Amino acid sequence: MAFAQSGGAGGGGGQRRPFFRRRKTCPFSGPNAPKIDYKDVRLLQRYISERGKIVPSRITAVSAKKQRELSAAIKRSRFLGLLPFVIR
């Protein structure tokens, strides 16, 4: 058969333990979570890269709903001049 795996070299043989990735929780959900506000520059800077881009939610573990709120707050803050568009 063309797709049968052989135990020989290059077969990718050994039994490897699966890597367990812990599920991250959203930092904006919960009882003591901070509110997303366009005036809170210190909070918003944590979700901007060193080049000034918005960090994706798969890295920051922010939920989809809160990521939309966060990006809107960052864009509003940029428009008002509280945050830079580009960091050189």
From Swiss-Prot:
Keywords: Ribonucleoprotein, Ribosomal protein, RNA-binding, rRNA-binding. GO terms for molecular function: small ribosomal subunit rRNA binding; structural constituent of ribosome. PROSITE patterns: RIBOSOMAL_S18. InterPro entries: Ribosomal_bS18 (IPR001648), Ribosomal_bS18_CS (IPR018275), Ribosomal_bS18_sf (IPR036870). Gene3D superfamilies: Ribosomal protein S18 (4.10.640.10). Residues 1-26 are annotated as: Disordered. It comes from the Bacteria. GO terms for biological process: translation. One of its GO terms (cellular component) is cytosolic small ribosomal subunit. HAMAP family: Ribosomal_bS18 (MF_00270). PANTHER family: 30S RIBOSOMAL PROTEIN S18 (PTHR13479), SMALL RIBOSOMAL SUBUNIT PROTEIN BS18M (PTHR13479:SF40). Belongs to the bacterial ribosomal protein bS18 family. Binds as a heterodimer with protein bS6 to the central domain of the 16S rRNA, where it helps stabilize the platform of the 30S subunit. Part of the 30S ribosomal subunit. Forms a tight heterodimer with protein bS6. This is Small ribosomal subunit protein bS18. It comes from Xanthobacter autotrophicus (strain ATCC BAA-1158 / Py2).
